[in-house]
């Protein structure tokens, strides 16, 4: 009911489309690395932040695409059946939570700024008639959850990879099978 009520208001009162949400979704995540490069004190170094960002992004991509193509909710503008959840909002809140986790001890305003940008991204998705309010609300929670899960997974993985007494090796190597190419990672646990 709330989805349709807000959707009706958007269609009735929207003056013009604003496409900046295609870019603002990335601002919080990029800010994590940019602040580190500028020397702002964070919880992890640049390499660790990059790994955390990659892990968060992987969890986000798997969960968003899994849900989009399972639920198949029609977008409010009727263009496609991949409305739920909002991927833009999920990515924005994933980055905002990364900002919060990395810089909350330096200044809580850094994380708050990330959340303001993420919330604005979600609001623009509704305003631009791309998503229902429920898609955006769920996407926000999912983005935060993916980042929190990445932090939980990172600590044990990091300990195993940096065990000084271990003679195990981790290897990254390219592969090509005649049709597909990519990188493979071998981790000895």
Each language-model region and where it sits:
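N-terminal transmembrane-helix/juxtamembrane module of multi-pass inner/ER membrane proteins
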Residues: 1-32, 66-77
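Juxtamembrane loop-transmembrane helix junctions in multi-pass integral membrane proteins
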Residues: 9-19, 42-45, 85, 102-106
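Hydrophobic alpha-helical transmembrane segments of polytopic
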Residues: 21-28, 57, 110, 114-117
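Residue-level signal for alpha-helical transmembrane segments in multi-pass membrane proteins
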Residues: 31-38, 121-124
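Interfacial segments of alpha-helical transmembrane regions
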Residues: 39-60
């Amino acid at each position: 009911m709330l989805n349709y009520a807000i959707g009706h208001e958007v269609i009735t009162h929207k003056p013009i489309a604003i496409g900046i949400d295609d870019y603002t979704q990335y601002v919080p995540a990029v800010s994590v690395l940019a602040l580190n490069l500028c020397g702002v004190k964070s919880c992890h170094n640049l390499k660790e932040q990059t790994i955390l960002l990659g892990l968060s992004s992987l969890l986000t991509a798997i969960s968003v695409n899994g849900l989009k193509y399972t639920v198949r909710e029609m977008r409010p503008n009727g263009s496609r059946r991949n409305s739920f959840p909002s991927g833009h909002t999920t990515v924005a809140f994933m980055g905002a939570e990364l900002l919060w986790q990395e810089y909350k001890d330096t200044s809580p305003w850094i994380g708050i700024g990330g959340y303001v940008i993420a919330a604005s991204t979600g609001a623009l998705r509704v305003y631009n008639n791309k998503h229902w309010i429920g898609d955006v609300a769920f996407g926000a929670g999912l983005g935060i959850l993916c980042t929190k899960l990445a932090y939980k997974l990172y600590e044990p993985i990091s300990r195993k990879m940096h065990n000084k007494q271990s003679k195990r090796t981790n290897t990254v190597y390219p592969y090509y099978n005649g049709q597909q190419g990519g990188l493979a990672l071998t981790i000895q646990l």
